[in-house]
Amino acid sequence: MGDREECLSTPQPPMSVVKSIELVLPEDRIYLAGSSIKGQVILTLNSTLVDPIVKVELVGRGYVEWSEEAGASCDYSRNVICNNKADYVHKTKTFPVEDNWLSAGSHTFDFHFNLPPRLPSTFTSKFGHVFYFVQASCMGREHILAKKRMYLLVQGTSTFHKETPFQNPLFVEAEEKVSYNCCRQGTVCLQIQMERNTFTPGEKVVFTTEINNQTSKCIKTVVFALYAHIQYEGFTPSAERRSRLDSSELLRQEANTPVTRFNTTKVVSTFNLPLLLSVSSSTQDGEIMHTRYELVTTVHLPWSLTSLKAKVPIIITSASVDSAICQLSEDGVLPVNPDHQN
């Protein structure tokens, strides 16, 4: 759900006073909302710089956009752009410079920022983006001399409660009466069992599927897939509210075990969730996008021109920093990000 990128420094003309500006941050780290970001700015000068402004910024933004047809019920129609945006965080630290000048050579500036406790996860799709970055810059008396930007991976937190009954449907069943060979009929029953259906990014999703084939045909294809359903919220140029639903397949497996005629087969499957995921959210959160997940098992019945599906809602949640540290401490493992300075 979003890759870390690094933008090149601003190109410098020959004999520029600034040779380079670099950002030093941990490689490929995923930051939990509410945690601390520590890093360094390394500024290298070709010559003395007077009255410099050296600063670093933490920025988080979201943006959604799509086009849709308007006036379809009238004699004419046209496409309108629907969009929306959100600002999640913008913090700036300006470094003190002794005597208001820096000599030629390298200068290192340490910084840290605290992420807000409630943030959406880094995300990108064809309709929306949520992104975070740290940007360092050096300004002279009149203009920016150099800047460098690095994008961050941020895992959002969730307020979904694990104990609500809706979030724990441990057993789902679907049944289909099918006709084949003109006059023959039979029944295919599909059951999914899970110990729980609430998970955090990086966890394993384990579930058991039972297929009861009461037909004289062999079932050869059973597909397991995890889908993300994302609803985007936006506005037209005339400020009319619009929404758009988009679905994507995150994970997919196919069972290699055929289900013979008049027989029952059990399949135990495991999905390894990505380390970075948008958390499940409701449409009442007031955000620019909302995410829900669904585990779908599909039995294809080509000889009857149909298929049978069973669906289980999956809840993706992520604890706050304080909760995560308490849990890790109980397990005897040191937290990844233990400092919470203001």
Swiss-Prot record:
<comment type="similarity">
    <text>Belongs to the arrestin family.</text>
</comment>
<dbReference type="GO" id="GO:0005737">
    <property type="term" value="C:cytoplasm"/>
</dbReference>
<dbReference type="Pfam" id="PF02752">
    <property type="entry name" value="Arrestin_C"/>
</dbReference>
<dbReference type="GO" id="GO:0005768">
    <property type="term" value="C:endosome"/>
</dbReference>
<dbReference type="InterPro" id="IPR011022">
    <property type="entry name" value="Arrestin_C-like"/>
</dbReference>
<dbReference type="InterPro" id="IPR014756">
    <property type="entry name" value="Ig_E-set"/>
</dbReference>
<dbReference type="GO" id="GO:0016020">
    <property type="term" value="C:membrane"/>
</dbReference>
<dbReference type="GO" id="GO:0007283">
    <property type="term" value="P:spermatogenesis"/>
</dbReference>
<dbReference type="Pfam" id="PF00339">
    <property type="entry name" value="Arrestin_N"/>
</dbReference>
<dbReference type="GO" id="GO:0015031">
    <property type="term" value="P:protein transport"/>
</dbReference>
<protein>
    <recommendedName>
        <fullName>Arrestin domain-containing protein 5</fullName>
    </recommendedName>
</protein>
<keyword id="KW-0221">Differentiation</keyword>
<keyword id="KW-0744">Spermatogenesis</keyword>
<dbReference type="GO" id="GO:0005886">
    <property type="term" value="C:plasma membrane"/>
</dbReference>
<comment type="function">
    <text>Plays an essential role in spermatogenesis. May be involved in the anchoring of the sperm head to the tail during spermatogenesis by affecting SEC22A-mediated SUN5 and NDC1 transport and localization.</text>
</comment>
<keyword id="KW-0472">Membrane</keyword>
<dbReference type="InterPro" id="IPR014752">
    <property type="entry name" value="Arrestin-like_C"/>
</dbReference>
<dbReference type="InterPro" id="IPR050357">
    <property type="entry name" value="Arrestin_domain-protein"/>
</dbReference>
<dbReference type="InterPro" id="IPR011021">
    <property type="entry name" value="Arrestin-like_N"/>
</dbReference>
<dbReference type="GO" id="GO:0030154">
    <property type="term" value="P:cell differentiation"/>
</dbReference>
